[in-house]
UniProtKB/Swiss-Prot annotation:
Taxonomic source organism: Kluyveromyces lactis (strain ATCC 8585 / CBS 2359 / DSM 70799 / NBRC 1267 / NRRL Y-1140 / WM37)
Protein name: U3 small nucleolar RNA-associated protein 25
GO BP, sorted A to Z: maturation of SSU-rRNA from tricistronic rRNA transcript (SSU-rRNA, 5.8S rRNA, LSU-rRNA)
Biased composition (Acidic residues): 99-113, 127-148
Major subcellular site: nucleus
Alphabetical keyword list: Nucleus, Ribonucleoprotein, Ribosome biogenesis, rRNA processing
Length: 704
């Protein structure tokens, strides 16, 4: 085997020669679903004729040589990165999986076995025998270079990609932005990575699907009119950046909006999958006519779309949406899917409406599901390596990517993802945000093992580990958070740029504007004194211990009934230890890791005045929405990420006032914040007020 020289353009000729020597092509068996992979279903390959088996063995050996050549190229060009280990984070992550409220009873052996079965290495490449047998009569492919499917993945030369790759590593790539005001309440921001002084214009606003090439099957299935499917106002805002393959971070206003944006991204995902498959099948025909033609149209593995959602209920809604829009009428294992993902149940009506929405239906958060499309049917529970779309929960895919048994770890099926969608990120953050970070650590990596792929047709930007420059990442959340921004700014390198919206909160839309309770609310700012974001927790803790704790000890208001609300669990541990070791304050605590006995006991002790202060975490409030009795004053260690939580917690005072247990003129609400709490603060007090609180001369502001 000749030595392969590393470099931005090297490897193509050698890989083509290695892979396609002899021009042998192998037909593969049908896909193996979770149910089909049981021991009772033995492969027919064991009974194959000796001559056929020998030919397959020769081809497999030949593929192994090709893959070794590929790895030689990749390792010389892209040394393996070493990730810093964080034992504390891993320990907390494991504890969160085992003990968090949303995970009760989900770690079943059956579900783990289903996932392991779906990872079994079975025959079948980017297209398999079933795809090859499909008729090409309805391949309506666009050759128009203005079609984003064409332009996005083919726009950049290898030398230009190499320059961007080097620029990102050297931190010489600069993002240039343009801002468009949609209304008084919302603006759109588009940023594009640049190597030079090119001008960045706003996203072209066509606001209609008719401007984009949609597969004929999807047009017929979705009753497209001459001007395209009628779009809602939200869909008009989203359609252009989405179908132009730009990264997106969208903060929606109402839970009813979810159905609208899912309509759009389901169509986008289907359109991408159908176009990808038909392009490959069409090129297969071209190669039969001219086998020397170079057609680069594939990745390492088949899956092209990854959808991450918090619960099975959300997954069920999305799969049903995909089925509805797919143009197919055959759905394999549909009844099994309904049994495992659908549940007709609602939370108690006494809980807030947002709680009822998030925790309706099947709230199990442990699953990974493969969807495979043929021209006639949708196969649910398909093997992951033969799937076109993978739908998962962060916890479910974490089991695969970071399995405690290193031999069972796999991430090759994520190597060729081109569209990644994270839905309901605000809910996912309360499960375990670290699992989302893990996905980004494993996506678009070079496969560790040989897979069924024709290396002569793999795009060079896959081989050069540059797929991250083309992957579209779409994030939907009810509330934009620093973590959401870190995904868009830190984990996404799409050369098409990134698009986000920003909602301006009017005073009457803010938490204090909708509170309906005339209680004294004091916002106290602490300065970082030149510190960075990494130093912020230390400055906050120092301010709390030096300013807030003395006010608790020498309170001029109520000496008991003080609810201390702490959003972050690590802050909670730090504060709890300080109060225990450094003060004489009698306090209780309830958090997401407390068992039911502790929750009941500590709430009762607080209610009856046996403890002066009760520590309460935001994650516990998200999952339980407790109405805590005997609350006379509230201290927010940090503004809540969800503005509804501010109102819900403060209203505990109002209920206590109604019962005659305290005087609203004596009760107080204190919230400590810094300039870095701008996103949360904006939703609590309103956009204009938040600007004053963050940058004003005063350090204390009061509302009533």
């Amino acid at each position: 085997m000749s030595k392969i020289r590393a470099g931005p353009k090297s490897g193509r000729k050698q890989l083509r020669e290695i892979t396609r020597a002899g021009q042998k092509r192998v037909r593969y068996d049908d896909e193996a679903t979770v149910a089909d992979l049981t021991p009772d279903n033995e492969s027919d390959s064991d009974n194959a004729e000796p001559s056929v088996a020998a030919e397959r063995e020769d081809v497999e050996q030949h593929r192994g040589q090709a893959y070794n050549a590929l790895l030689t190229l990749l390792k010389s060009e892209h040394p393996e990165r070493k990730h810093k280990s964080n034992k504390k984070i891993k320990k907390d992550s494991q504890r969160a999986e085992e003990d968090s409220p949303e995970n009760d009873g989900i770690n079943s052996e059956d579900e783990q076995q289903n996932i392991e079965n779906a990872l079994d290495d079975v025959s079948g490449g980017v297209v398999d025998e079933e795809d090859m047998e499909d008729s090409l009569s309805d391949v309506d492919e666009s050759e128009d270079e203005s079609d984003p499917f064409e332009s996005h993945f083919s726009k950049y030369s290898e030398s230009r990609l190499y320059a961007f790759d080097k620029g990102f590593k050297d931190k010489t790539v600069k993002y240039k932005s343009s801002k468009t005001d949609v209304s008084e309440e919302e603006s759109l921001i588009y940023s594009k990575p640049c190597l030079d002084d090119e001008e960045v214009l706003p996203v072209k606003g066509k606001q209609t699907l008719s401007s984009y090439f949609i597969k004929q099957k999807l047009k017929l299935a979705n009753d497209f009119q001459n001007n395209g499917l009628p779009l809602t106002e939200i869909q008009k805002e989203l359609v252009d950046p989405m179908f132009q393959y730009k990264d997106m971070l969208y903060e929606y206003d109402d839970y009813a909006d979810e159905d609208q944006y899912r309509d759009l991204y389901s169509l986008h995902a289907l359109n991408h999958v159908y176009k990808t498959r038909d392009r490959i099948l069409k090129n297969n025909q071209k190669l039969q006519e001219n086998n020397d033609e170079e057609l680069l149209d594939q990745g390492f593995t088949r899956p092209k779309v990854l959808i991450v959602v918090p619960t099975r209920d959300a997954a069920h809604k999305i799969v049903r949406k995909i089925m509805e829009k797919s143009g197919l009428d055959q759905f394999d294992k549909k009844s099994k899917f309904e049994d495992q993902f659908f549940e007709d149940s609602l939370p108690p009506t006494s809980k807030p409406k947002s709680f009822q929405h998030i925790f309706q239906g099947n709230t199990n958060d442990f699953f990974v599901l493969g969807l495979k499309f043929t021209r006639k049917s949708l196969k649910i529970y398909s093997n992951f390596y033969q799937s076109d779309i993978i739908i998962c929960s962060p916890l479910g895919i974490q089991l695969i990517l970071e399995n405690t048994d290193k031999k069972k770890r796999q991430d090759d099926f994520l190597s060729s993802i081109e569209v990644m969608i994270i839905d309901q990120l605000h809910s996912i953050e309360y499960q375990n945000a670290m699992h989302v970070t893990t996905i980004f650590q494993h996506i678009n990596k070079i496969p560790e093992q040989q897979r069924e792929a024709d290396f002569s047709r793999i795009r060079m930007w896959y081989i050069n580990e540059q797929a991250k420059f083309f992957r579209q990442t779409i994030v939907f959340t009810k509330y934009i958070s620093p973590f959401a921004n870190s995904i868009l700014n830190g984990k996404c390198r799409n050369l098409a740029g990134r698009w986000k919206n920003h909602r301006k909160i009017k005073p009457e839309q803010s938490s204090i504007g909708q509170l309906g309770l005339k209680v004294r609310q004091i916002f106290q700012r602490f300065d970082l004194a030149g510190g960075t974001a990494l130093d912020e927790p230390d400055y906050r803790f120092k301010f709390f211990t030096s300013v807030i704790v003395p006010s608790i000890v020498k309170s001029t208001g109520y000496e008991d009934g003080i609810l201390l609300y702490i959003p972050d669990y690590t802050d909670f541990i730090r504060v709890r230890n300080y109060l225990k070791e450094k003060t004489t304050i009698i306090f209780g605590e309830i958090n997401e890791y407390s068992n039911q006995k502790q929750l009941t006991s500590n709430r009762a002790r607080f209610q009856h005045g046996k403890v002066k202060v009760l520590l309460y975490t935001e994650r516990l409030h998200h999952f339980r929405r407790y109405e805590i009795k005997n609350v006379k004053s509230v201290i927010f260690y940090k503004p809540p990420g969800n503005p509804e939580f501010y109102s819900e917690v403060v209203r505990n005072i109002g209920k206590n006032v109604f019962l005659g247990n305290c005087d609203i003129n004596i009760s107080t609400v204190r919230c400590i914040y810094s300039k870095m709490d701008g996103l949360s603060l904006e939703r609590v007090v309103g956009s204009k007020r938040a600007a004053v609180l963050a940058h004003g001369q005063n350090e204390v502001y009061e509302f009533k």
